[in-house]
Curated annotation (Swiss-Prot):
InterPro entries: Glycogen_synth
Key words of the record: Allosteric enzyme, Glycogen biosynthesis, Glycosyltransferase, Phosphoprotein, Transferase
EC id: 2.4.1.11
Protein known as: Glycogen [starch] synthase isoform 1
Gene: GSY1
This protein's pathway: Glycan biosynthesis; glycogen biosynthesis
Length: 708
């Protein structure tokens, strides 16, 4: 019986399903609404059960209740019953996010007694070794086998639907070679969000990674770092998948050389873009959140607060504490050069640079807490005195011209300000003073290893100590932000909105959600041409015009380290010297780019990847279904095509709009898009069910900006 390609089932597999660890969690969570709108109950996520977090992430459902499953999905219920009878424990329910997709979380401890048997089977089938004490690899093997068990049962019981399994990262990759070896009738897609070797080699910081990709002895490099078995899993997954994809052009280049298979396409990461009805709304949000950051800055720099907040800009870098990979080293060095330039030029501008990277700490410093309390106490006292003065002015004006009052308004300061209030105000003001020679701290927490912390050591090296003469001030906040923070009570998104510029000079960043999030919120950012996001935007926007849209791209691939640092310092200085009006206009342009990052657009790339998988797995059936002639030569190749870039913006750029007959490829680089390369516009009729509108209308967006 032929499987139904149009009404197929989709299972997405990852270790970060309902389990926040890194960026894949954000990808799955933000993509879910679009995927659920497209697939409905035919979409299920599979992953390992994290007992510590699942109860707050998942609404459990009674999977034994037949009403939970539509009739055509009863094979899934029967498979779960069979696995439960054989001792496999799991949680079935709805993920508590927008779209509420169905999830199956397998308890790996319930199958751990199979570990040695499955390891032996993995060696005999695929030849992949697995050391005994690598717990992460052990869990990857358990997850791979239990997923293959599940998919194998479902494919046997359900002969009517085509089944697609989409696997993210090597931790979910064990299942791919097993599906191939065990001949399970499932279309497989593997997406690598970062290669193992790439992350290890770049973290070392002593190699020109991207310009030497073709020269690495991958087996030797993996062996030297003790990850050869993990590398084997990753490489086997890439080679046995029907469709192999990465998240960016730069990662595709990396995967081609390190994993020895050229990716079939690119699946860029998107975001759920919330559009405002009017431009001024997000500008007002910026002003509100900036005021909260101002409150923190007043407290942190009390006693040395000699700069004008209206003439101050806020820069920040945020992410995992990967000192070199995330470009923290380059950021600090560029800040030191910027500080020198501003001092030499006599600039009145001040830069406050935040580093938001979690490190091991004991607690907030007493000084950080005390500083905020001192300023808050002054603010409360001033508010109380102000209220009293207002009341006295009101009483005075009410009594005039009676009681011998000669003026409509009080003219005697003593009449307005009582002596007790003067004393209280003086005490509060004197409390602001710091001991002689004491400077505002550069870190807000007590570090567990202050002496060996790379960020603090570099700050000491470049002598950015928050001296009064410094035009660049530095604050290292070694903890992710949240609204319950006692010194900087903002969630991360609120903090980003309040800042002026995000700086992310990463050296190894397969995609880069942080600059993408900045773009969606209308905050200009600095990225690099070796980050996925930077390469993506560089491909869409004319290189010399990207900064007009608030996207500054530093060259870390073809310039020397010193030249890259100088370029970053140039970009930051250029931004500092902008007027307030110029910054507002730039934020408007930046926010308009957000449509290019919406999952409603990016989700199409996933549709195309599934299409290519179905074409390869069922070529003749697919040809009959869509009624087209596809040559064998075009079946497994992705053609290039003419690409257009966004031109220089006008002072008030128009809204993005799709042009008819456009051949713009949303996937950057040489690989092209899966859909365009296979002339597969018909697939929208087969798969999206109207969830993703592909019509040309005023609400659609593309790589074009038209003047309205």
């Amino acid at each position: 019986m032929a499987r139904d390609l149009q009404n197929h089932l989709l299972f997405e597999v990852a270790t970060e399903v309902t389990n926040r660890v890194g960026g894949i969690y954000s990808v799955l969570k933000s993509k879910a609404p679009v995927t659920v709108a497209q697939y409905g109950d035919n979409y299920t996520l599979l992953g390992p059960l994290n007992k510590a977090t699942y109860e707050s992430e998942v609404e459990k459902l009674d999977w034994e209740d037949e009403s939970i499953f539509p009739e055509e999905l009863l094979p899934i219920q029967k498979t779960l019953m069979s696995m439960r009878e054989k001792g496999v424990n799991f949680v079935y329910g709805n993920w508590l996010i927008e779209g509420a997709p169905r999830v199956i979380l397998f308890e790996l401890d319930s199958v751990r007694h199979f570990l040695n048997e499955w390891k032996a089977d993995l060696w005999s089938l695929v030849g992949i070794p697995s050391p005994e004490h690598d717990h992460e690899t052990n869990d990857a093997i358990l997850l791979g086998y239990v997923v293959v068990w599940f998919l194998g049962e479902v494919s046997k019981l359900d002969s009517s639907h085509a089944i697609i399994g989409h696997f993210h990262e090597w931790l979910a990759g064990v299942a791919l070679p097993l599906c191939r070896k065990k001949r399970i009738d499932v279309v497989t897609i593997f997406t690598t969000h970062a290669t193992l070797l790439g992350r290890y080699l770049c973290a070392a910081g002593d190699v020109d990674f991207y310009n030497n990709l073709q020269y690495f002895d991958v087996d030797q490099e993996a062996g030297k770092r003790g990850i050869y078995h993990r590398y084997c899993i990753e490489r086997a997954a890439a080679h046995t998948a029907d469709v192999f994809t990465t998240v960016s052009q730069i990662t595709a280049l990396e995967a081609e050389h390190l994993l020895k298979r050229k990716p079939d396409g690119i699946l860029p990461n998107g975001l759920n873009v919330v559009k405002f009805q009017a431009v001024h709304e997000f500008q007002n949000l910026h002003a509100l959140k900036k005021d909260k950051i101002n409150d923190f800055v007043r407290g942190h720099f009390h006693g040395c607060f000699d700069f004008d907040l209206d003439n101050t800009v806020y820069f920040f870098i945020a992410g995992r504490y990967e000192y070199k990979n995330k470009g923290a080293d380059m950021f600090i060095e560029s800040l030191a050069r910027l500080n020198y330039r501003l001092k030499v030029s006599g600039s009145k501008k001040t830069v406050v640079a935040f580093l938001i990277m979690p490190a091991k700490t004991n607690s907030f410093t007493v000084e950080a807490l005390k500083s905020q309390a001192i300023v808050k106490s002054l603010e409360n006292t001033v508010n109380e005195v102000t209220a009293s003065i207002g009341k006295r002015i009101f009483e005075h004006t009410m009594r005039y011209p009676h009681n011998g009052l000669e003026s409509e308004l009080p003219t005697n300061l003593d009449e307005l300000l009582k002596s007790s209030e003067k004393v209280l105000l003086k005490k509060r003001v004197l409390a602001l003073r710091r001991p002689y020679g004491e400077l505002p701290p550069v870190v807000t927490h007590n570090m567990c290893d202050d002496a060996n912390d790379p960020i603090l050591n570099q700050i000491r090296h470049v002598r950015l100590f928050n001296d009064s003469s410094d035009r660049v001030k530095v604050i290292f906040h070694p903890e992710f932000l949240n609204a319950n923070n006692p010194i900087l009570g903002l969630d991360y998104d609120e903090f980003v909105r309040g800042c002026h510029l995000g700086v992310f000079p990463s050296y190894y960043e397969p995609w880069g959600y942080t600059p993408a999030e900045c773009t969606v919120m209308g905050v200009p950012s600095i990225t690099t041409n070796v980050s996925g996001f930077g390469a993506y935007m560089e491909d869409l926007i004319e290189t010399d015009q990207a900064k007009d849209y608030g996207i500054y791209i530093v060259d870390r691939r073809f310039k020397s380290p010193d030249e890259s640092v100088e370029q970053l310092a140039d970009y930051m200085e250029e931004f500092v010297n902008k007027t307030r009006r110029q910054r507002i206009n730039q934020r408007n342009r930046t926010e308009r780019l957000s449509d290019l990052l919406d999952w409603k657009r990016m989700g199409l790339e996933y549709v195309k990847a599934r299409q290519l998988g179905l074409r390869r797995a069922y070529p003749e059936q697919f040809k009959q279904l869509v009624g087209e002639t596809i040559s064998d030569a075009n079946m497994n190749t992705l053609a290039g095509g003419k690409k257009f870039k966004i031109a220089r913006p006008l002072s008030v750029p128009g809204s993005p709009k799709v042009r008819s007959n456009s051949t713009v490829y949303m996937t950057p680089g040489d690989l092209g898009t899966l859909q365009d390369a296979n002339n597969a516009d018909d697939y929208f009729n087969l798969s999206t069910n109207g969830a993703i509108d592909n019509d040309d209308d005023d609400n659609d967006t593309s790589a074009y900006y038209e003047d309205n």
